[in-house]
Curated annotation (Swiss-Prot):
GO terms for biological process: lipid catabolic process. Its EC number is 3.1.1.1. It comes from Fungal sp. (strain ATCC 74256). This is Probable secreted lipase phiG. Glycans are attached at N49, N262.
Length: 364
């Protein structure tokens, strides 16, 4: 039996430790991780919801003036960028090695970012969805699917690499307007905190990148969009219906002249597909309205050869170009980088694709 005074002393010491832990809960102390210094913090939102978890990685000898913010796509977290599912170095290490400070975020209501029950609704992806769209596309659900060769392993349930990838899938906020709006605000708050940066988005997060640039044009040095949510306006396989009334976003983005209330003044026209392996595009009628704030921000849209985005990725680049954005379209297949799917930054040649992005950033 612990003596009474010893028990009291133990409780007091524990209380002090708990208070110290509570006071440092929202931001960790920096710690040496060998080649870089790391920390984490929360930013944006309110006390109960819509803050984002952020990890900061700083090289021991930074050589680049602007950091890179990485925002993962649907069902993913910042861990996407750390290593590949089969254990190879990820893009975070690559850009750290090239002197960039790196910020990895978890979207609002995602992963380590808080979610207040009752706001929107949460969903998760089953194994068949992950196989069909990302890892094992040996089918004909889109014309380029059979070209997919770069996923490590079989891409099927039971394969160690697939199982590691699927274990990293998390629930996501399925109310897309809530997700886009909250992530735009939280990542804008991150820019307010850290200053000018490049914003790198993947998939679902693509529309956030456009809106973050629209909200903070003086702080976004460039936008790298890896197969961003698209194409403009209307969904394509595996989704259907009207999704982005503002062209490249769900929520309001600034045009000049104005797009009107709820984008009702955006007139569109259908442009025929460039060939049988691609879809038609919805662009603006001439003369187009210009994306007022995005015009000042250079953008890179990256499309993979075998992805389900492959039939329509060029439409997003064409829409941005028509609206006055300084955009470059990196069609990986046409550049000789073959066999990639939607999760290109995790695949066997992930660092070859990282070189494409690095080259573009260094030109800005």
């Amino acid at each position: 039996m612990m003596p009474f005074m010893d028990l009291i002393l133990s409780i007091l010491v524990s209380s002090v430790l708990l208070l110290n832990c509570k006071s440092s809960f929202h931001e960790s102390p920096r710690r040496d991780a060998g080649s870089e210094v790391t920390s984490f913090f929360y930013v944006g939102g309110k006390y109960e919801n819509f803050t984002i978890y952020v990890e900061e990685y700083v090289p021991q000898n930074p050589t680049q003036p602007y950091p890179i913010i990485f925002i993962a796509g649907a069902g993913q977290t910042g861990t996407n960028w750390l290593t590949t599912p089969d254990g190879r170095p990820g893009w975070a290490s690559f850009f750290l090695d090239h002197g960039y400070t790196v910020y990895l975020t978890d979207q609002t209501s995602r992963g380590r970012s808080p979610w207040y029950p009752g706001i929107g609704f949460m969903v998760a992806s089953g194994t068949s969805d992950i196989e069909t769209l990302f890892t094992s596309t040996s089918h004909n659900l889109w014309p380029q699917a059979h070209l997919h060769t770069q996923w490590p392993g079989t891409g099927k349930v039971g394969d160690p690499t697939f199982d590691a990838f699927y274990a990293a899938q998390v629930q996501l906020q399925a109310d897309q307007p809530i997700s886009e709006e909250s992530n735009t605000k939280a990542h804008s708050a991150l820019l307010d905190r850290i200053g000018p940066a490049y914003v790198l988005t993947h998939s679902q997060a693509g529309s956030y990148g456009w809106r973050i640039g629209d909200a903070r044009p003086n702080l976004v040095k460039g936008i790298v969009a890896l197969e961003p949510a698209g194409p403009p306006f209307d969904q394509k396989y595996p989704y259907t219906g009207r999704a982005r009334p503002w062209g490249i976003t769900i929520g309001e983005i600034e045009y000049e002249p104005s797009a009107g209330p709820n984008a009702t003044d955006l007139d569109t026209v259908i442009i025929p597909a460039k060939d049988q392996d691609h879809t038609e595009c919805v662009l603006q009628s001439e003369p187009p309205k210009l994306l007022k704030n995005l015009q000042a921000i250079p953008a890179l849209v990256v499309g993979a050869e075998a992805s389900f985005h492959a039939p329509y990725e060029y439409c997003t680049a064409e829409y941005l170009k028509q609206a006055g954005v300084d955009v470059e379209f990196a069609d990986l297949g046409e550049q000789g980088i073959k066999g990639n799917g939607h999760m290109m930054f995790m695949e066997k040649n992930n660092l070859e694709i990282a070189e494409v992005v690095l080259t573009w950033i260094q030109k800005q």
